[in-house]
Amino acid sequence: MKLLHIDSSILGDNSASRQLSSQVTKAWQAAEPSAVVTYRDLAADAISHFSSTTLVAAGTTAELRNAAQQHEAELSATTLAEFITADAIVVAAPMYNFTVPTQLKAWIDRIAVAGQTFRYTEAGPEGLCGGKKVVIVSTAGGIHAGQASGVAHEDYLKLVFGFLGITDIEVVRAEGLAYGEEVRNNAMSAAQAKISEQLFAAA
């Protein structure tokens, strides 16, 4: 089994999403000792956003690309291959201004590729990544579940992965992390309990 672990928070060791995603990955490895983990830190090693260079590189043969275009082509190919070959993905997704971090959006733009992870048919778009499992580690300073704002970044990620054909999606959520120490501790404890008692209870 191949497990892809994605972090995207800019907070380093102070990040709740990083702490929880690490726990998910460790629990997964304990449940499946043969799992091979690929780790990508999108904050420390950011993926560049789409640009005209990215698009030109995709439509230019390798021998005709300049250095910048070749870099973009290799980055796209490596990022896509990591996703396609993964059996499961752990995505740490803190809420930044009601959506995902820009670093995570840049990664999504590299994996949502027509003809590779989805295709268009006469009946509409069809995801090509069925069979994968995704665990979204969702964190937020505020409390959004059940509120007018909703948990927008979770909904977005579910939409993206669903579009790619992935239906096995679990969410580990810790919110209200900026509401004081007691609320934060309770939220983290609840998320940790879900990881150990629900996601991997049978392990």
Swiss-Prot record:
Say yes or no: keyword NADP present. no
Q: Which GO terms describe its molecular function?
A: electron transfer activity; FMN binding; oxidoreductase activity, acting on NAD(P)H as acceptor; oxidoreductase activity, acting on NAD(P)H, quinone or similar compound as acceptor
Question: Which Pfam families does the record match to this protein?
Answer: Flavodoxin_2 (PF02525)
What keywords were assigned to this record? Flavoprotein, FMN, NAD, Oxidoreductase
What are the required cofactors? FMN
Q: Does the keyword Cytoplasm apply?
A: no
Q: What does this protein do?
A: Quinone reductase that provides resistance to thiol-specific stress caused by electrophilic quinones. Also exhibits azoreductase activity. Catalyzes the reductive cleavage of the azo bond in aromatic azo compounds to the corresponding amines.
| Description of how the protein assembles with itself and partners | Homodimer.
This chain's protein is named FMN-dependent NADH:quinone oxidoreductase 3
Species for this entry: Pseudomonas fluorescens (strain Pf0-1)
